């Protein structure tokens, strides 16, 4: 089945990512064998998307944030390349997820029912651009309406386990530095003031139940 094949590609993609991680310096130096390993990982990523029928194997909350920036509702025009924006967004999302993990670990994360607390901000940003109607259509019905506080509370330990699988922030920064990736929003021309709005608004750009969207039911 497509799902079974998707699981196979997921395992292969994970292995390929580890290989890329182990060859960062060689990739940065442009060594042929290392670059081939990088391309192989990228191809597997594409195949994983094809097998699962969506872009989730290679596109998560960090891409939703980039879509937000491309809409220019919280920022002006950015000259940065798509990959540079994804790189900066990846660090923002990783920082937030690690912050959440720390709160869960300390028992300081509280789950509450979803409330539409972003209405004013949505009107100020997407409404000003004249695209709020399209955004509301994209997000109707609201995915969080089907998430119970009991279910989410029970899932927190598993969420913590998954976040702990992600690289530490310092490790990710080091890896990005090795290959010359940007890791700060200011590197792509964004002021730090847009970070919180980006975290709040990014989930609305795609109708996906991401952890960044679930964050709207969490206080930590």
Model-derived features with residue positions:
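Short alpha-helical scaffold segments that flank and stabilize functional sites
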Residues: 4, 93-96, 201, 205
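Single conserved hydrophobic/aromatic residue that forms the stacking wall/gate
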Residues: 1-9
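Generic alpha-helical structural element
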Residues: 27, 34, 54, 58, ...
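Intrinsically disordered or highly flexible coil/loop and linker segments, enriched in small
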Residues: 26-33, 47-55, 74, 78, ...
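Short, charge-rich amphipathic segments
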Residues: 3, 17-32, 130-138, 157, ...
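C-terminal charged capping/lid subdomain of soluble metabolic enzymes
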Residues: 103-220
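A conserved active-site cap/scaffold subdomain adjacent to cofactor or substrate pockets
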Residues: 17-24, 33-99
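Electropositive phosphate-/nucleotide-binding environments in soluble metabolic enzymes
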Residues: 10-21, 28-39, 59, 84-87, ...
